Amino acid sequence: MPYTKYICPDGHEVGIDECLTACRLEGQVNPNTGELYCPAGRCLSKRTLIALADQREWTGTPSTTQLLAGTRENYLKITKEYAIDPKSSLFMLHGTKVHDYLEKYTDDEGISEVRLDDGTSTGAFDYYSAENGGTLYDNKTYGSWKVAKILGLYTKRVPTGEVYKTGAKKGQPKYRNEIRSGGPRHRLDLAIQLNDYRMKIEKELKKPVNNLVCEVIVRDGNTYIATQ
């Protein structure tokens, strides 16, 4: 079953239809802060809440991305009603918008957003290019921390060669964090997803795939935290 409720800013759950009819927290004050829960009358615009409520219905055949989650998690999502925090789910709209925008610029020899069924699962790949012997592209929107883990980047404390001259740490060496490469690359989910799309394209479309590429938009790029 799809999610049927939203989690309000005060932690209570409300049916999506009820939420869209009227915000239950309009004009209500948070007793912990003394401020309105929803200064704009809603936690998010009605348009955004409607967009978040749009979900793909369960057809009986799993999708590639669905199978990346655990079996128990998928079973519960299919058989039980549940609630989501709409503000924490806004990333879904961002990813959908990026895919829809890029699809408009698919070249004549390229193929994009085609859902394939190989008899085991369905999967809609982002973009296939005939260049370089066949290249499959997948577009992602990630935070900088996840990107660093995928690329095998990590921080290491190294001495600066200086010491603290005053304070509680006087005489102790100073350190700074340096970003290093060569760490473990946590990208198993990407490998599973793209290779499943590759096998579907080779089987169903009879096209070669010799390269797998993930194009990532970093949500918090060009921010201080992304450099840390």
What are these language model-derived features?
Residues 176-187:
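Surface-exposed cleft-lining segments at the edges of enzyme active sites
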Residues 209-219:
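Acidic carboxylate-rich catalytic motifs and surrounding loops in phosphoryl-/glycosyl-chemistry enzymes
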